[in-house]
Amino acid sequence: MADFLGMMKQAAQLQSKMQAMQEELGSLEVEGISGGGLVAVRMTAKMEVKGIKIDPSLLKPDEAEILEDLLVTAHGDARRKAEAAMQEKMQAITGKLGLPPGFGFG
């Protein structure tokens, strides 16, 4: 019975930590860059795009295809960084539970 109560307490603590992590991920921003800095995409670790910067040299009609490619690349870079930040936060929480490697959430 004591083990069950301990597990319930641990589950409640985990839920509280997960909620705090979700809030933190919403405010944690990463930046993806492409074209040597010609294009940058800022997003939260919850994958919400917050801003896009485009070098004025790319704002020409004949540069549209290049700009499109750079935007896709910068977005992908930002997404990978956001996913890495989320995994890092998850490991910080689930690592304290003593779960085997790869058994965390997400």
From Swiss-Prot:
SUPFAM superfamilies for the chain: YbaB-like (SSF82607)
Molecular functions per Gene Ontology: DNA binding
Xref: Gene3D superfamilies: Nucleoid-associated protein YbaB-like domain
Disulfide bonds: none
Keyword annotations from UniProtKB, A to Z: Cytoplasm, DNA-binding
Superkingdom of the source species: Bacteria
CC per GO annotation: bacterial nucleoid; cytosol
Signal peptide boundaries: none
Compartment list: Cytoplasm, Nucleoid
Keyword check for DNA-binding: yes
Alphabetical list of InterPro entries matching this protein: YbaB-like_sf (IPR036894), YbaB/EbfC (IPR004401)
HAMAP family: DNA_YbaB_EbfC
Family membership: Belongs to the YbaB/EbfC family.
PANTHER family assigned to the protein according to its UniProt record, in alphabetical order: NUCLEOID-ASSOCIATED PROTEIN YBAB (PTHR33449:SF1)
Entry function: Binds to DNA and alters its conformation. May be involved in regulation of gene expression, nucleoid organization and DNA protection.
Subunit structure: Homodimer.
Name of the protein: Nucleoid-associated protein BBta_7345
Source organism (scientific name): Bradyrhizobium sp. (strain BTAi1 / ATCC BAA-1182)
Organismal lineage: Bacteria, Pseudomonadati, Pseudomonadota, Alphaproteobacteria, Hyphomicrobiales
